[in-house]
Amino acid sequence: MAGLLPRAYGGVLRRSYIYLGSQCSNSVSRLTVGSTFRLVRMKSWGTSKFHTNGSPVLNEIKKISKSNGITIINPLVNKVTTNNVSTSSNGKAAVAAATAATAVSLGSTGQDDALSRNTDFLHIQNILLQKNQDRMNKQKLLSEATNFYERFKINTKWLLIRGNRPFSADEIGTLFSWIILSQILWIILGTTTFVSILLIIFNTVFAKEMVGNVVGKLLNIFLDGIDVKFQDALVPEWRKGCIRFNNVQLRTHPLQASEPENINDYNELVNNMIEFDLKLHQIELSLSLKKWLLGNGLIQDLTIMGMRGNITVTPVSLENKIDDNQRVNLIDWFSNPYYHLGNVKVTDSSIILHDNQLSKDFKVSIYNLDMPQLRFQWIINDFLSSNVVDGSINHSLFNIHKRQHKLAYIKDLENDLSDWKRITRIRLDSIDVKKLGLNNSNAFNWMDDGQLDIIADVMLPNEQENEPDFDFTRNKKEHMSKSNNKYVVLDLKFRFKDLKAIFPDRAPRLSNGEEILSLDELKQIILFINRKYDLYHSYANSSYKNTLWDAPNIAINKAKSFPVTTVFQSKKDFSNEDSDEEDRKLKKQIIRFHDDISTPNNELVLSCKVVKNINELKNMVLFWETGIYDSLSMELYIDLMKMVEEWEYKKKTNWMTDWGSSVASQLIIVGFGAMV
């Protein structure tokens, strides 16, 4: 039984739902709330409006109801009483009309709300009954199934289409598209997991060594000039969420020697900048398809353990640049300079770094390195921002870490450091000058021997979250309102121990070939350093090797143009404990007319500060490319010249003071003699 009538409220035609009773007898048709209902969708009968009086549809309903003996008591309680009539076509139509009349609004707002509440309740009851019927049908089908395949088929179809009928063409297309989309989403969100499952499948089906060789050959296709070999299986590490490679070998292709006329070729210079032959005990990495789609590389996080091998670096100096507008940097060697890595860790590694520019070999050992990120365009900045770096250069320890404050860390201190992202402390302990290659450098070619300690505090500016590449030209007003700081400040202290100098063949020069100072000016520096060196060693030898040192009140006369009498007080043994204070006063010391020893260990301390724009570090891999070495050299020479001038002034002042006092004393004596 179905009744299709529109409902009008406020003169606007709308769709609605009515519920028709299905409980009819041969003699009586009665609609009650407790009857079984089913949902019938009402459709519009055109654009005619319903009114309480005068509507042709309402008049027709009344006429049919009256002819069949149906009396509408109250349309709001869904209760209709009928007279005893036989079920005929007119009776069915009358029941439909009477039931539809209960859904027609009579112009009262309260009556419409009550009817709406009743229909919602009946709608919910109908849904629950339908679900119960579907559940009974599913249980019946499962009980009739004879094996697992049939039960799986029934459950799958019931989950997808709520039935056991065959799939239609539209449903098959929908399922296929959803499978494809889910796989694409899985690859994007879980690239490492996807590749790990592929490796497990390949390792199961094929030999593990063959899988490693195939993967290595595929990588060689995409990596120009680099050979990759996997000597062991590729094992996914599920607990760490990464892929592990054991016994990996990386090697650059041997390049053929270029012809003499092609030495200045740009591509040839770039290809010969880096050569390496490395063996890695273990590599763990995770992948990210999102980074690869953005052009930042496929590898997300990287962990290297047990790296051994040789690396040869041939920097192209400014003197050998191709032209004035083209500069060759080490970043040009990388095929993708926009490569970004996430967390990078290197442990238990040792390599031999050969610098062709200095013709020196450096043995670099890395005990522990932890970098939160590594961007090829900002290698220097990211390296200085490392969480920790511990290692050694030619068996001299170095470390990079966040500087520890001597005072307690309070909120005021945090506000003072708000302009800086962090302050990094770099320390290099007791490295030999020759092993460091300073004697072969252009700027300090006069250094012959000695030890060097370096302490540097590097202050890095804050990095904007929306500007990871330090592009200060974009959103300039917004950036300048937050922070005006875009400079890197390096505060360095060089402590030379037992430094010895020789006269070089050519004057010190910067990386671009410009002279720092002339050879005549360099003579004063060499004289000052060697005088300190000779004085310290003569003092040490006389203290520990001279047998006359034990004799009291020894006077040493030296033939110089000015008095150089030096008095040493001998060390005496006192048995009386009360004389300890007097013993402390009787120290070996140099009295006047002699060059003072500034430090007991013959140390030469030079301090300097270098300020660099952060944008000048972009696309720079080596420090000498940034020009920091040239700035450091100039600052060190300025500080060294100040020390030499102070030493000469002090020596001259002491001589003039002594000469004046001696002449005055002689004049006084002569005067007294004349008076007598």
Curated annotation (Swiss-Prot):
The protein's matches in Pfam families, at most eight in alphabetical order, are given as: MDM31_MDM32 (PF08118)
GO BP term, example = mitochondrion organization
Q: What is its main location?
A: mitochondrion
Mitochondrial intermembrane topology ranges: 205-655
Q: Would the keyword Transmembrane turn up in this protein's UniProt record?
A: yes
Physiological role: Involved in the organization of the mitochondrial membranes and the global structure of the mitochondria. Also required for mitochondrial distribution and mobility as well as for the maintenance of mitochondrial DNA nucleoids structures.
The record ties this protein, via PANTHER family, to:
MITOCHONDRIAL DISTRIBUTION AND MORPHOLOGY PROTEIN 31 (PTHR31068), MITOCHONDRIAL DISTRIBUTION AND MORPHOLOGY PROTEIN 32 (PTHR31068:SF1)
Query: Which protein is depicted?
Result: Mitochondrial distribution and morphology protein 32
The record's gene field reads: MDM32
